[in-house]
Amino acid sequence: MNLSNKELEGLDEIISDHREDFCPFLGRIEEEDKQFFLSSEMKEMYAGDTVPDFIASLQEAVKMPGQIYFATRASIGEWAFVTVFTDTLDYMEVSPTEYQEAKEKTVLGENAAWMPSVDLKPFNRDFPKPSSADFIGKGVEFLNRHQSSRIFMNPEKGLKQLLDFLRVHKYDGRQLMLNNRIDSVDKLKKALKKAQALLKNKSDETEWEEVESDMAHLGFEPGWGKKLGYVKEFLALLSDILAAPEPVVLEKFLDRIPMIFSLVVLSPHGFFGQAGVFGKPDTGGQVVYILDQVKALEHELKSRLDEKGLDITPKILVVTRLIPEAEGTNCDMEEELIRGTDNCHIVRVPFRDESGEVVRQWISRFRIWPYLERFSTEAQNIILSKLQGNPDLIIGNYSDGNLVASLIAQRLGVTQCTIAHALEKTKYLYSDLYWQDNNDKYHFACQYTADLISMNYSDFIITSTYQEIAGTNDSVGQYESYMNYTLPGLYRVVNGIDVFDPKFNVVSPGAAPDIFFSYKSKDRFPEHIEEIESILFEDNLEGSRGSLADPDKPLIFTMARLDKIKNLTGLVRWFGENEELRKTANLLVIGGFVDESLSSDDEEREQIRIMHSVIDELGLDGSVRWVGAHLGKRMTGEFYRYVADRKGVFVQPALFEAFGLTIIEAMSSGLPVFATVYGGPSEIIEDGKSGFTLDPNKGDECAEKLLEFIQKCQSDPGHWIKISDNALKRVEERYNWPLYAKRLMTFARVYGFWKFVTNLEREETVRYLEMLYGMVYRRLADPKEY
């Protein structure tokens, strides 16, 4: 039979040309005492000399009586589904709904009750999107091309929209771009010619005030620039758009419009603070990311406003949760100025229970869902009060922050940016399928529903890597995993998010350059050396286990939260089971608590027990040092450099890492890095050139890779220097905060324009998402479920 999807054409070939390999392959699946099979498992089960395209494309299989359902992914974002009848080798293509129904039957049985299907594809049918995977994560670039084409094809409509957009911008009641003298495209064209003639012979260094009256008479207000050289460039861009719009010109023009003066960053969960919070539950890289982010954004906003000559002080609020039982941190303070900024503040809003009483203690990020709706309302009122009006942009972080951002942005009509940091669905295998088994602990169904709502509400989504969106040829992206999935007994998703959607953009963060800089620098932080050496070598140090019997060995250093995904216990086992590596190097682990009784997090306590067990089992107390310290940023930067001085390495052994800020920090310090191949690190690191990637599922190979590098550096010290220099060069060119801030503000302006010209077209989507929120999310977030 012929299949309509080109992804499945290889099935004909495998049945006709490789039947002798395909039949045993199906037989092995049938013999297994389980119903679900992963891509890696199926590739190992196929015994042919060559791997046909169909086998290579397999992502998952579901075994049912007499037939096997396969999910195939021939290329990024391109999925198809087929069922093969094992007795006859007949097969047929099935829909995403039919495939999900097969999975549901394995959980709920043959007579499962009817379930609704969530399908957002019809709402996006008329929205432009690229067809090539090369454009995934380049949404702004694609939209500029599309919008330029729209203006060119229908200049009357397109230019009228641009005019209306220019007329809408004001601050504190004053127009910034155009006044009421220009109320048509024809008048704009005439006024523009007169303005360019007026400015033509004036010095570029002349300031706006000298021509303000004449320009206002023509219809132009002060937002065009401080100095006339800048104003001339701005007007020339407008002239080019009016004549023949080009994508690059349109982006440059929109990027100069003064439209962002205040923004709100939402990050409710964990202990969000500037000191004493790192190492506490649910508190890690996201806090560092946001604090560095807002510093860079404030600097960018101030620079842009200065170019415009506008005497406006930008304001940034980071809204998080107030925790009265703050455990020695400042998380019980309602407001706190962010150090290193002029007007960026942490604003803390409490969680309240059903009676309105403030919840005093920390709550796991997996259990905060009942509090978020009330939190969003209270936070919105505080935001409006402190900003004296609406923010110009709202940025959500992680699942909880993105949901709150969606609720506030929809109520206020503000542009929303989504940053996931990490989507839990790809971290926990089959966590959607077996959500009911883990509901008491993790509440995954509630979280995944919140994710689905917020990523579709959002005007634009930024990710640190391409893989976060769409994976690789061999692995599924985090967002891609939301294209179709099922929560048996609740609902199934047949079209949840489209990775080709132009709302996706990749922009990578950096590390604070005043903290994380090369070990070669003479301007170091010597005040921390004594404490660093205490952490490494002091006998009977409180909160530590193990000692380094031979302290002169090269040091393998790792530092992360002590949870299952970060896999610190896995690294200790790799190290301990490789005798040669133990003889050659020492291992320092900084993470969690050594004393289980000090932890309030269930998963962390489990990892503490495992860590002690591994050290005991392998007898590692003389070669592994485990410290439960929580380092400040300056201390962390100097720690990386101290390890680099001793020609050590940094290892990030996570089972999955969405980005890997510690990797950027270590590389910025000149420390060679070994990091997981799963997720963002494989984009950051050029394997073998600026660092090394590891497959955490193959611990013996990871240990050998570490050993090989350390031994090579001992025989050839220049090898360590080469990798170190390449790491420094890599982060300098690709991962820095000024570039991040510039791009994010460009995105905000372009998507602000896109929202303006298409807002009415999104109403149907909003109503659909409101229904999903009201009928599903609210029920899952009912306090009685917690």
Curated annotation (Swiss-Prot):
- Activity relative to temperature: Optimum temperature is 65 degrees Celsius. Very thermounstable, complete loss of activity after 15 minutes at 60 degrees Celsius.
InterPro entries noted in UniProt = Glyco_trans_1 (IPR001296), Sucrose_synth_GT-B1 (IPR000368), Sucrose_synthase_pln/cyn (IPR012820), SUS_EPBD (IPR056736), SUS_N (IPR056735)
Signal peptide range: none
* Gene3D superfamilies linked to this entry: 1.20.120.1230, 3.10.450.330, Glycogen Phosphorylase B (3.40.50.2000)
**Region GT-B glycosyltransferase, residue ranges:** 259-736
Q: Does the keyword Cytoplasm apply?
A: no
Q: From the UniProt record, which GO molecular function terms apply?
A: sucrose synthase activity
Q: Which organism is it from?
A: Denitrovibrio acetiphilus (strain DSM 12809 / NBRC 114555 / N2460)
- What is known about its subunit structure? Homotetramer.
Would you identify the family this protein belongs to, as annotated? Belongs to the glycosyltransferase 1 family.
Task: Give a short account of what the protein does.
Answer: Catalyzes the reversible conversion of sucrose and a nucleotide disphosphate (NDP) into fructose and NDP-glucose; although the reaction is freely reversible in vitro, the physiological reaction seems to be sucrose cleavage. Unlike characterized plant enzymes prefers ADP as a cosubstrate, whereas plants prefer UDP. Its preference for ADP over UDP suggests it may directly link sucrose and glycogen metabolism.
Q: Which key words tag this protein in UniProt?
A: Glycosyltransferase, Transferase
An example GO BP is: sucrose metabolic process
Give the pH-dependence text from the record: Optimum pH is 6.0.
Protein's recorded name: Sucrose synthase
EC numbers listed for it are 2.4.1.13
